[in-house]
Amino acid sequence: NVIESNAIGDVLMVQADFDPFYTLQAVTLAFGIDAKPIDIKVSGKAPGPGGAILEFENNRFANLTFIAYPSEFPEVTEITGTKGRITLEQPAHCPTSLTVRIPPITPSRYMRDNTPSPSQRFDYPLPSSVSVPRAFVNQQGFIYMIEAIHRCLAARLLECPQFNKQDSLHLMEILHGVLKYR
């Protein structure tokens, strides 16, 4: 894991756009499932467009933009650390690629000659064995979640070790903190 290995340094910022649930999943991915916001500012009324800024300890922030349908939006997630950046490419809620950028000199490429950071792209192809009629973009990528559930059921597990009940409840608590202002 690029975040856990500290390859991008300490995560300082998450920027994401889509709906509150998916953007908040990116926040818990970046800051850790146990991170709790110390302040939440929300603008906009559901189901229209809006946004939220979540502040976490140690001067860390999440800047989330909630879109309204129909509209054209980037749906890209950026996770910025002290040493580099991760981009979950479009569509970020179920991406097929991510890009890691780590400049040779930190804290910023702007400190020198403004040369773009070297990047490394990782591609995750969609399963070709799944046909989903009238599917949304990359929807067949969710097959990986379904396979994880099947593995847990076959092993007689009551919850998935990668995202357990406590993780789900924590994410729902943060989601409630955002939605109560929308």
Predicted regions located by residue number:
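Rossmann-like dinucleotide-binding domain that binds NAD(P)(H)
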Residues: 9-80, 90-92, 166-170
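Active-site loop of classical SDR/Rossmann-like NAD(P)-dependent oxidoreductases
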Residues: 113, 118-126, 133-147, 163
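C-terminal helix-rich "cap/oligomerization" subdomain common to oxidoreductases
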Residues: 57, 144-182
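Short helix-loop capping/hinge motifs at secondary-structure junctions, enriched
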Residues: 6-11, 156
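Short polybasic amphipathic segments
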Residues: 77-79, 94-111, 117-127
